[in-house]
Every structure is written in structure tokens, then in C-alpha cells.
Amino acid sequence: MKPIVLTKDNFDAETKEGLTVVDFWASWCGPCKMQAPILDELAEALTDVKFAKVNVDEQQQLAIRFRVDAIPTLCFIRDGKLVNQVVGLTTKDRLTAMINISKA
């Protein structure tokens, strides 16, 4: 399943149950463009995890809320609470490990 788009209006409702991997990104960010296909691949493979995207240029309030000061930033939110965060381009193997840690 493709990642969903989060805004300040739907963020809390979409992340309140289960594990959600939230990709804070921007259209002008080269590393973000390289991260996207990795996240898309994981989203297809891991059906028990929700994947979502937040455009930091359009959703500055969310970027501030999660203290995003570099992109890409990936936030791992379990049952509405931030449990892990990774900044920078991240490999598929590291993301898989972070997802498994965040599920526990």
C-alpha cells in the first residue's frame, strides 16, 4: 500500500493505533527522493505497518511539533506516541531493524 499523506488535520487520527512510519520530506530534497522508493517497497511488504508522508513545506506545524530540522527525518509512532526517530537517508536494512525495534 502506498504511503498516505498526513496533514495537521488528520495526523493524530491516522497515527493513534499501531505503528506508523512517518517520512518528513520536501520536493526539493535530493536524499528525500532517494528515500521514497525504499519506503514504498517496505510499505508494500509490511502490511502490518502504516507508512505516511509529511511535506515539511506545507505542514510546518508538524515539522516543529516533531523537531524536524533536517530531512529526510523518519518518525516511528506507535499508538500515537513517538518511539524512534532517524535523520538522513536510511538503508532498507536499517529501516527494517528500526521498524522491528519500534514494534516491541
Segments predicted by a language model, with ranges:
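Conserved redox-active cysteine motifs that mediate thiol-disulfide chemistry
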Residues: 24-38
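Structural micro-motif
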Residues: 20, 60, 66-75
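Conserved helix-turn-beta segment immediately C-terminal to the redox Cys motif
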Residues: 18-19, 34-54, 58-60
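N-terminal leader/targeting and pre-domain segments
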Residues: 1-18, 101-104
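Conserved Rossmann-like nucleotide-binding pocket used by diverse enzymes
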Residues: 2, 25, 50-52
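Non-catalytic, surface beta->alpha helical segment in thiol-disulfide oxidoreductase systems
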Residues: 78-104
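Short acidic active-site motifs
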Residues: 10, 58-62, 94
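Short active-site neighborhood of thiol/selenol oxidoreductases, capturing the structured segment around
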Residues: 15-27
